[in-house]
């Protein structure tokens, strides 16, 4: 199959799978609905109680699973492109832990104030990335050193987060603990503001910068010869990736491994780097939607935080990836 046809097939297949999983998620739960009831509720012609179940309880969760998964997929693709390293992702480097530190500070100081949570998550992610970048700088950036320092910063931030939880009230600690596991439980449309619009804005920013990202993949000298400001472009792309991670953390907590795994699966499916961000977004959305469905259904009537499922599957994938990289060397 020609690459262009294979690319189109993979994008179409991912989109169809996302749509099917989304509809299945809307009909399944403590109250199982027919497909006709789901579509009637979406069109506003179902009874009021069914419409409320679908549009107010389940649809926000499904929509945010797709949006957050896509955001993490794009963020991971940008990091792996900039670092030229398959282990380059915001969760491995600790950026989502930094964003979570910001969320935790906001919850301790301001309670569950959504605007404060979003902006402190952004601040935490940006400050963490600047700290990692500053410590890794030695007349330039070596990606291996950057990742190792990121892992170290992540460990220190986890210790800081544990200390904050111990200082918080019992109610705040319980809420923060559930959020820390990475959860889409209890999401409503009101809880998506202002993080969801920020993710959409960052998607637009990523699309505007995708050409620069592809030129940077050719090497700094080649990109510079083609008129690209290397450091400025790298900084803008990094900012977009960090804000995508921070906004996702503000909505659902620090969900791990989606950003690491989605770009790899996207490349394997398509066999090309073209449309890399689109493929990574679709893979991320599909992975998180599937993980959330598993978290809801596997242990009924109990529901797991979706982060437990992604960590379990992502940990296995990370081991396989490390073994493959060691064999190459």
Language-model-derived ranges and their functions:
Residues 1-329:
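Alpha-helical transmembrane segments in inner-membrane proteins
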